[in-house]
Regions:
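Helix-terminus/linker motif at the lipid-water interface of multi-pass membrane proteins
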Residues: 35-52, 123-125, 187, 192, ...
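N-terminal membrane topogenesis motif
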Residues: 1-36, 91, 95, 232-254
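Alpha-helical transmembrane segments of multi-pass membrane proteins
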Residues: 128-152
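Membrane-interface helix-loop junctions in multi-pass transport and translocation proteins
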Residues: 160-164, 174-217
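Membrane-interface junctions at transmembrane-helix termini in multi-pass inner-membrane proteins
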Residues: 145-168
């Protein structure tokens, strides 16, 4: 007789291995594309070290706000949704997704508006680099779209749809790499701080493209996912929000501390050069 005791585990093991491979490929592709476009724009006439300085300084503030708003979202949502789907509680899974979307859309809106309105004061008083205000203003809208994308990525991860999540990362980075080079070339002849703002506006456009891809992917697959019960969604909003934040905040704190350290280093170096 053939021993079939381990047979049911094989599809799961194969699926897990495929998911890990997809994530690894996506991460490698993102890193390579990111490295290539930074090398290219640094060597574009007029950008150089000055433009790179504005680009990097503004990006540190952006990374800090992303750490506050979105770093812990995918893992927290994926964990909660996977727990619900494992119990076939699809209504509960949809409820978590909707609650998370409301929370982080709100957080993203507030932080995007704050960064846009306070771009110049942050550049002057925090970074000690006045020209970086253009970069911060260009990056501001992307925080909202990153928050939205993070919720969708958590949903797809929790429902074991890793192809969508990995594809979205590669698509976003491909747009960012290509558009950054195109936008910087379009700004040749302008001041380095303006060229830097053009470069970072490509990040905003890329995050919009990534969010749109994830939204369409969700809508296309939504019909295959059992609908949530309407009753109780509003009543359970705050308990569900508390669960999401309890998981997301501790993960975000580590990234926040790291981002603050990098921002302090950047400000210290800038002040030393002055």
């Amino acid at each position: 007789m053939t021993n079939t005791g381990n047979t049911p585990q094989k599809p799961k093991q194969k699926s897990f291995a495929s998911n890990v491979l997809l994530i690894l490929i996506a991460q490698v592709a993102v890193k390579v594309l990111g490295m290539l476009y930074r090398m290219v724009i640094t060597n574009i006439d007029g950008f150089g070290d000055a433009g790179n300085g504005f680009y990097s300084a503004g990006y540190q503030v952006y990374i800090l706000l992303l750490a506050i708003s979105s770093v812990g979202i995918p893992n927290a949502i994926a964990k909660l949704i996977s727990e619900k789907t494992a119990l076939s509680d699809y209504g509960g899974a949809r409820k978590i997704f909707r609650t998370a979307l409301c929370i982080f859309a709100g957080i993203g809106t507030v932080l995007s508006a704050a960064l846009f309105l306070l771009a110049d004061p942050i550049a002057h008083y925090v970074l000690h680099l006045d020209g970086a205000g253009y970069t911060l203003a260009a990056l501001a809208p992307s925080i909202f779209f990153v928050c939205i994308s993070s919720v969708f990525r958590g949903y797809f991860s929790g429902t074991n749809q890793m192809k969508v999540m990995s594809a979205s990362q590669v698509i976003e980075q491909a747009f960012k790499s290509t558009l950054t080079i195109v936008f910087v070339l379009a700004a040749v002849g302008m001041a380095p701080e303006i060229m830097s703002a053009y470069a970072n506006s490509a990040t905003t456009v890329a995050t919009i493209c990534g969010a749109l891809y994830l939204t369409f992917a969700y809508l296309r697959r939504k019909k295959n996912f059992p609908a949530a019960q309407k009753a109780g969604i509003k009543k359970d909003f705050f308990p569900t929000a508390k669960k999401i934040l309890a998981l997301a905040v501790p993960i975000s704190l580590c990234s926040v501390i790291s981002a603050i350290n990098r921002m302090v280093d950047t400000a210290t170096i800038t002040r030393g050069i002055e």
